[in-house]
Curated annotation (Swiss-Prot):
GO cellular component, one term: cytoplasm
SUPFAM superfamilies: S-adenosyl-L-methionine-dependent methyltransferases
Functional note: Specifically methylates the uridine in position 2552 of 23S rRNA at the 2'-O position of the ribose in the fully assembled 50S ribosomal subunit.
GO molecular function: rRNA (uridine-2'-O-)-methyltransferase activity
Protein keywords: Cytoplasm, Methyltransferase, rRNA processing, S-adenosyl-L-methionine, Transferase
Natural source organism: Burkholderia ambifaria (strain MC40-6)
Name the UniProt record assigns to this protein: Ribosomal RNA large subunit methyltransferase E
Region span, Disordered: 197-220
Cellular localisation: Cytoplasm
Membership in a protein family: Belongs to the class I-like SAM-binding methyltransferase superfamily. RNA methyltransferase RlmE family.
Organism superkingdom: Bacteria
Annotated binding of S-adenosyl-L-methionine, by residue: G60, W62, D92, D108, D133
Enzyme Commission no: 2.1.1.166
């Protein structure tokens, strides 16, 4: 019974959520697009000509937002009509419906085959921005969940270290609670500038937050 009440409350909140309504109206696949939008507007992350990698991209709202932003900056005299000024590569273990001008690779980005596909698209270029909305399946056991969250952040940090330009940026989702300070410390070890971000589109009751790192301390 309690679970049913929880589901009813969640459904009511979801249906009446202004960001859900806005996403439906503007064609985004999830309200998460507005989290990236707010952070981007504050920190000017996405700019014309960039190479962007979206980790854990499915269902695709972050890639949609990045695609729309790069389409706005398109140089019409040099880019084909309908294209974008830049490159977006989305990766996920799960399938994702196609998005115009977005390269999607399904698989684990730690595996050689997936990395080869990524390198084929990059064509030797370094990455300007890595964005990660990855989140684990939470168990409700604080210590186990903290370890899973930290593991995903570690994967994003390692990917960024291997692929980012020296002045590139990494934005990841994490959660306040056990293990959060350790994640922040890892960011500080890797980046010159580190800042937490809590966009308004994150639900008030959620411990969800984002960490932004800029400028690698030891670029490869």
């Amino acid at each position: 019974m309690a679970k049913n009440r929880f589901n009813q409350h969640w459904l009511h909140d979801h249906i009446n959520d202004p960001y859900v309504k806005m996403a439906q109206r503007e064609g985004y696949r999830a309200r998460a697009a507005y989290k990236l939008k707010e952070i981007d507007e504050q920190d000017k992350l996405i700019r014309p000509g960039q190479v962007i990698v979206d980790l854990g991209a499915t269902p695709g709202s972050w890639s949609q937002y990045a695609r729309n932003k790069l389409a706005q900056g398109k140089k019409r005299d040099t880019q084909r009509e309908g294209g974008i000024d830049g490159t977006i590569i989305a990766l996920d273990l799960l399938p994702m419906e196609p998005i115009a001008d977005v390269h999607f690779i399904q698989g684990d980005f730690r595996e050689d085959d997936v990395l080869r596909q990524l390198e084929d698209v990059l064509e030797g270029r370094a990455v300007d921005l890595v964005i990660s909305d990855m989140a684990p399946n939470l168990s409700g056991v604080a210590s186990a969940d903290a370890a899973r969250i930290e593991h995903l952040c570690d994967l994003a940090l390692e990917f960024a270290q291997n692929h980012l330009k020296p002045d590139g940026a990494l934005l990841v989702k994490c959660f306040h609670g056990s293990g959060y300070s350790q994640i922040v410390e890892k960011f500080k070890q890797q980046f010159k500038v580190v800042a937490p971000r809590k966009p308004k589109a994150s639900r008030d009751k959620s411990s969800e937050t984002f960490i932004l790192g800029r400028q690698l301390k030891q670029p490869r």
